[in-house]
Amino acid sequence: MPPDFSPIRGAQGLQLSNPSVLGVASLLGSLQVFQEAGMVGPLRTRSIELTAYLGKLLAQSAYFVSAHEAAMRLPLCAVSSTDHDQHRRPAFTIITPSDANSRGSQLSLLFFSSDAELMHKVLEGLRSYGVIGDERHPNVIRLTPTALYNTVQDCENGAKYLEEVLKELDI
């Protein structure tokens, strides 16, 4: 090798002949956790069960609307003044496919309200209870029960806290 470094251009320049010891050590720990959990098969089964259970709990919410009712509400940004009172109450539906083979473990909740800030308020309310969700603007919150460490109780708490937050925001 010459004494001067001459990098290879492009993505090939990022190749390594030996991985970092720290990177491999953290990978080993992660693989050991997956091995203890039974690897991918049992984790996927548990993921399907947890996600289905969370979906069932969310569908029991007083603020949940069916796919049919959600379709009637969709042009929300064009709500007329006569429709305003009908859509004042916060509501949500699940837009993730119901078939477990057509989705991962995440459920996307689409929120309906005349309040443009509803999704942000709900997300902040959930965070105050320790429920971590992911936001997609303008009005979707994604909740994901993770098979490695979430429990049935976590799903029950998440659904309960969502109900409490929406109740607090209901005018």
Residue ranges of predicted features:
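PLP-dependent enzyme catalytic core of the Aspartate aminotransferase-like
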Residues: 115-121, 125-171
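Conserved PLP-binding catalytic core of the aspartate aminotransferase-like
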Residues: 48-55, 59-129
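A general structural signal marking secondary-structure boundaries and capping sites
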Residues: 38, 62, 166-169
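Short amphipathic alpha-helical segments
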Residues: 10-12, 103-107, 139-144
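Non-transmembrane alpha-helical segments in soluble domains
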Residues: 28-31, 55, 159, 163
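Short alpha-helical functional segments enriched in proximate histidine and acidic residues
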Residues: 33, 57, 61, 165
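Active-site C-terminal subdomain of aminotransferase-like
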Residues: 1-46, 52
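A generic fold-level signal
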Residues: 19, 101-102, 135
